[in-house]
Amino acid sequence: MIQLTILFIGILTTFSACKKDDKTIPTVISTGNDPNFTIVANSDTGFSNFNRKVVVFGIDIYAVATVEDAKLLHAVNIMAQYLDNDEDGTVDNQLVLNKMLENKAFLVMWKNESDLNIEPPSDRLGQDLGNDETHPSFVTNGNTGPFDASLEEVLHIINNAGHSFAYPNAFGQNIGSDLANAMDIARGGQFMTIPSQYPANAWYTYYDQTCDYASCQTIEYLYWALTSMLGAQENRLNEIDNEWRLNTRQKVEDTDTAIFSILTNPIYKMPTVLPDGSYKQ
């Protein structure tokens, strides 16, 4: 993931209401071959770099012309599977989706960094995902090979625009939320700035100086915990242990009891199956 110029800060952006641009990109758009979703031409205000989009339960996923259709549709299916994890055609947690819709949540898919030189409306919350970091075969190959960043970036926007607003006491990106309290334990203390060295007993040790306590560290922590519980990190310990050490469900359950309790609370209806990009197929 990279940061959108000016407006993208850390892993999220605050972006305002949608109307159509006068200028559209005169490109023939393939509708794709997905049985559940259709690629359509895009002309939404603030997204003129992106020639097409797919709408998933009301959430816009935009792509520039150089993003592969297969990768766009893969991200779409990942979004659908996170939101409707049992794939019965109805989102599992309507409150979370409602908050995403209120925040006009979106995902933008890019090929080159310059694609992110955009100015989305100011009341929209967004996240970016790169074409070349999207690897549809990761899960179907037994969670091996190049990691599929759609598992991270799609989850970020759901957590940021959805869970944080639907359940502020539990998932609020602020000191004192259940999520932040659990994170403080995982980091070995409450660090408002990145320490030069985390305590030896910490298992979440993110050293990115651009990642602040609230809007970034909390969301990254939530991603690591949930995807580890879903199995995405089981073969990646050597790649990720400089940042996260509990790469399996059992390790999270045994060591990070606070976050495990939150994520298994049936009230929140968190995903229990790792998306593989094959929604209702």
Can you describe what each PLM-predicted range is?
Residues 63-70, 142-146, 207-219, 243-251:
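Conserved aromatic-histidine-acidic binding/catalytic patches
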Residues 33-63, 67-71:
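Start-of-domain marker
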Residues 13-37, 281:
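Bacterial Sec-dependent N-terminal signal peptides
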Residues 56-196:
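Acidic/His-rich structured neighborhood in mature extracellular/periplasmic domains
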Residues 3-14:
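Bacterial N-terminal signal peptides
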Residues 33-35, 41-42, 46-49, 78, ...:
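Generic detector of solvent-exposed, compositionally biased contiguous segments
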